[in-house]
């Protein structure tokens, strides 16, 4: 089984197999999801102090903040430029 990894900006990489949604942080429901994840300790801030432009939701209920546009992350997800790690299980 191979693990597909996606760069979400500034050298941060997440497993593409675990992504559920990539959304914009502008709406009130998404802001509420971010706050609830922060309260639960499930928020990962990968913005390096920059403005949050994409919110990535994973199947483990982690919420990841990225400074890269959602369209850019989605494009990286659909291209062949991703890092693939072979797992010997």
From Swiss-Prot:
Q: InterPro entries given for it?
A: RemA-like
Q: Which family does it belong to?
A: Belongs to the RemA family.
Pfam families, sorted: RemA-like
Provide the disulphide bond pattern: none
Which named protein is this?
Putative regulatory protein CPE1749
Q: Which domain of life is it from?
A: Bacteria
């Amino acid at each position: 089984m191979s693990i597909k990894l996606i760069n979400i900006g500034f050298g941060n990489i997440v497993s593409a197999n675990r992504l559920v949604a990539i959304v914009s942080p502008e709406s009130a429901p998404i802001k509420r999801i971010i706050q609830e994840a922060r309260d639960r300790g499930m928020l990962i801030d990968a913005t390096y102090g920059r403005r949050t432009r994409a919110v990535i939701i994973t199947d483990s209920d982690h919420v990841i903040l990225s400074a890269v546009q959602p369209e850019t992350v989605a494009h990286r997800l659909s291209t062949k430029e991703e890092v693939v790690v072979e797992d010997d299980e």
